Amino acid sequence: MNMKYALRSEDTEQMGVIAWCSWKRQQYPELALLHHCPNGGRRNKAEAVKLKQMGVVAGVPDLHLPVPKGIYNGLYIEMKHGEGRLEKEQRTFLKAAAGYGNYCVVCYGAEEAIGIIKDYLSLKPIDTGDGENRMKIQNASILRDGKVKAM
């Protein structure tokens, strides 16, 4: 899809993240496992019932990287844009996933998400003991316009 003239939205920001990840796969082979779980969007009733029966869960974040880094088991990113807000189910899922040892963050834009991914992939293994095995931004945070706030 040609994004040259696309209006910015949560979707286009996420597409930008995925495009960057595709471009950087040789440098970061782990990015081959980054994926989007298409939980969101409007569905007709029959499709919604079918998806629920298949295991769709409300609140699952947009991006998941199931690769342990530092002290974390994996990375979850919920993408937002503009005035987008977290739904109750999203907040609940992110906090629960963080409680199970995942690094979870909400990013308002591709640049913030890419920065988080780069920082996450640069984490050292747990046993180094040098403090470089934790993310600088607190777990379960919201990043917006360079500012960090707790979920």
PLM-predicted stretches and their roles:
Residues 1-151:
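Catalytic phosphate/metal-binding cores of nucleic-acid and nucleotide-processing enzymes, i.e., regions
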